[in-house]
Amino acid sequence: MHICIPVTEELQDTLGCRFVLYSVYLEGFLLFKVRYKDLHLWNEQIHRVFGNGLPKFPPKHYLAMTKNMANERRLQLEQYLQQIVTDPVVTSSDIFMDYFRKLQMDTFNMPTVKLILRVYVPDGAAVELDVRTSDSAERVLEAALFRLGVSRELAEYFSLFITHKEAKGPFTVVKRIAAFELPFLTIWNLEDDQFQIEVRKWYMNPSNDVMLMGSTEAIDILYLQAVQEFQMDWTRPTKDQEQKLQHCLKEENKLKFLELMKTVEYYGYLQIASCASDYPECDSEVNVWVGNNEMSCHFHSPGGHTEHLRLNIRDLICWNVSLLQPKKQEVMSPNHQHLEFKFEYQQGSSLKCITIRTEQAFLLSSCLKKMLSEYPVHRSKEELEIQVDRAQATHKFNIRPVQNGVHTKKQTLLKDKAEYCLIDDISDLNL
C-alpha cells in the first residue's frame, strides 16, 4: 500500500483562522481529507493504546510556517501515514478502523445508511449484500464469501478488487481494495458505471490452489477466474492444451479444467493492460504478466523489433511507482491517472533500468510485494528494496531491509505483515 499527499488546500474555519487540508491518496485514489490538528489529536489517542512503538508524528509549529516548513510537514505526514497503514497490529485495532472510517465518511459527506451492494464474481454474476455505507472491505468480503458459501477460514486467499469492463473492450483489474477502505465509497467516487467490486483470489503462486481444493464453493470461484483468464487470452496454452480445455468447458468439468490450467503458461498470473515503455526504445509497447515468482515482459518497438524479458523475483533489485501530478488547473481523477512503474534488475554484472507507463502501476507493485511475502526463502532474500516516489516533488521513499535491528535517527521503522523495513528520504539525484 502506498500513501501520498499530492494535494493540499488552504482554507478558513468559521472563526476566520486559516488552516491546511491534506488530501490523502491511497494508491492513486483519494482516501480522505484531514487537518493536521485532527491527526495530531488522534495520534495522542493511539499512543495511549500502543505506546512508543508508533512512528514519530510531525511536531507542532507555534509560529507561522514558511513554505519549506509546510512542505516538510506534508512529507512527514506522508511517512507517518505510510507506516501506520502498513502496521497490521494498528490497522486491525478498533481505534484505527473507527477513525479511518470517520475520515472517509466525512470527506465524502456520506451518512451511514443501509443499502444493497452488488459484489461480482469473475463470470459477471453478482451477489447482493445487505450492508451499510460505512462497512469496511474486510466486513464486505466476509459477507460476500458467506453468501458464496466459502468458509471464513479461507478468507485470507481472497480479496475485493475494483475491476473495469468496457462493453466492447478489455477487462482490467484496477486495484485491490485495502481492508480498511469502505468499498461503497470507493466505487461511488468513480464516475464510470463500468467499474465494479469483484471477489478474486489473492495470491500470486498458483500452487496455493491446493489449499482451496477441499471447498466446493472455493473451487467454483477458482474455476470462474481460470475460465476468465483463459477466455481473455491472459494465458498462453498450446493448441493441444486449448483443445483439451475447450472440451472441459463443454463438459463443465471444473476440477479437470483447473488441473489442466496448472500446466498452461501464465496461469494464475495477473496481466497488465498493454502499455508504453522506454525499452528497447522510446514509445515501445509492452505486455506484462506477473505471478509465480516472476515478471514477464513482451516488448514491441515502433521499428518492429520484439523482445521477451523474463525476470525472477530474485533478479529485481528495486522498483518505484511515480504518481505524476496534474497541472494546477487540472484535478486529479482516479479514472485517469498518470503513473510510471520503474524497475531495476541484474543482467550479468550490470544493472538495467526500465520505465513502464501504466495506470495499473500500484497494482503491479502490490503483486510484487505479495510475491515477496509468499516466496519460500530466508527473510534476507525476501526483502527487496522498494522505492516509492512522486514525480514533480522532491520527496521520495526508499525502503530497505532492516539489518541487525539498528536504525539511525533519520530512519523510521516500517512494520509490515511479511517484512520489517526502513524508510528514509532520498534526493532526486538518486533516480
UniProtKB/Swiss-Prot annotation:
A single Gene Ontology MF term assigned here is:
phosphatidylinositol binding
Q: Which CDD domains match?
A: FERM-like_C_SNX31, FERM_F1_SNX31, PX_SNX17_31
Function statement: May be involved in protein trafficking.
Q: Which residues form a coiled coil?
A: none
- The answer to whether the entry has keyword Transport is yes
* This protein's GO CC annotations: early endosome
Q: What InterPro entries is this protein classified in? A: PH-like_dom_sf, PX_dom, PX_dom_sf, SNX17-31_FERM_F1, SNX17/31_FERM
Please provide the record's keywords in A-Z order. Protein transport, Transport
Which BP terms from GO are recorded? endocytic recycling; intracellular protein transport
The record's PROSITE patterns line, in alphabetical order, gives:
PX (PS50195)
Q: Which family does it belong to?
A: Belongs to the sorting nexin family.
Pfam family name, one: PX
Q: Which segments constitute the PX domain?
A: 1-107
Output this protein's name.
Answer: Sorting nexin-31
